[in-house]
Amino acid sequence: MRLVVVAAALTGFLATPAFVSTQTQPAPSASLAPPPDAPPPHPVAPGPYAVSVISEPTLTTHTVYRPTDLSPFTAGQRLPIVAWGNGACSNAGLLFETFLTHIAGHGFLVIASGPKDAPLPAFASRVPGQARSQPDPNAGIAAGSTKDEDLIKAIDWAIAENGKSGSAYAGRLDPQKVAVMGQSCGGLQATAVAGDPRIKTVVIWNSGVFNEPNGGRGATLSGARKESLAKFHAPVAYFLGGPTDLAYANGKNDFSRLTTVPAFLGSIHSGHGGTYMHPGGGWFGEVGVAWLKWRLNGDQSAAKYFEGADCILCTDPIWEVAKKKIK
């Protein structure tokens, strides 16, 4: 049976989704390998725009994903800005290439922390479904890893380029449509900077602030604390990987603490590695585009994924859903 929870404040919520076995589940894990009983890959068609993945000379610390042809993006249809923080606070701009390329192909400027030419970390793999092992995410930030401020740096750069005469982006970006997103440690980074007044939506992927007092082990990864949640001022979405996702309990706990902003929680049994490496980013690619189109562009077709008791994710048995201040 499907359960959709709509409430102002929840603790200990969300029943076991229909697709999860009632037998003993594996313990939550940082492994990026999908659970053995995960739903099959969900290929997603690309967006209407060809995408270029580039290193900009004025922002070599980041990797830019954007439509190759910027000419369609003028007054009335400017590109929204999306700043992205990598899992493991990795300083590698191509770590989520499949997923971020899909987002950009739907008409978004995506700026990922980390240089384009940086080597991928040892745990990374671009092969869908291949088991991957991730270092302990509580081990601290290694030298050269990204920081919370890198997301703000990305936003600052994009807005400056939009107003710079002679820039390829001049007049083609929309400073009123800014999102910040991140996976795992990158989700902590997004949480830490969510109070920036320019941000119009926050998307947290496989992440949540550690439940220990004062941030516990999470304190070594980011400046995010439970107190950071009080600074949220824009709609937020949490997308988690089910009970085997290391961040599942933390993400649900963060969601339970939100009382002032529209919030959506969607979880699919995919583990901590989500579906980012599936074609088009799989389910995460599809729902990520839908959330951004709705919250940044006002796309009411995209809103159908999230709004109403009969929303697309609400009625799909592989999704576990909770909502606050969203009809």
Model-derived features with residue positions:
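Loop/turn elements at helix/coil->beta-strand transitions in domains of secreted/extracellular proteins
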Residues: 77-81, 106-111, 175-177, 197-202, ...
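Serine-hydrolase catalytic machinery in alpha/beta-hydrolase-like enzymes
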Residues: 55-173
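The feature captures the conserved acid-bearing segment of alpha/beta-hydrolase catalytic domains
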Residues: 200-278
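Primarily recognizes the serine-hydrolase "nucleophile elbow" in alpha/beta-hydrolase
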Residues: 154-231
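N-terminal cap/lid segment of alpha/beta-hydrolase-fold proteins
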Residues: 25-77
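Signal peptide processing junction and immediate N-terminal pro/mature segment
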Residues: 17-25
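Bacterial N-terminal signal peptides
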Residues: 5-17
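Alpha/beta-hydrolase-fold serine-hydrolase catalytic core, especially in secreted/extracellular enzymes
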Residues: 270-273, 278-327
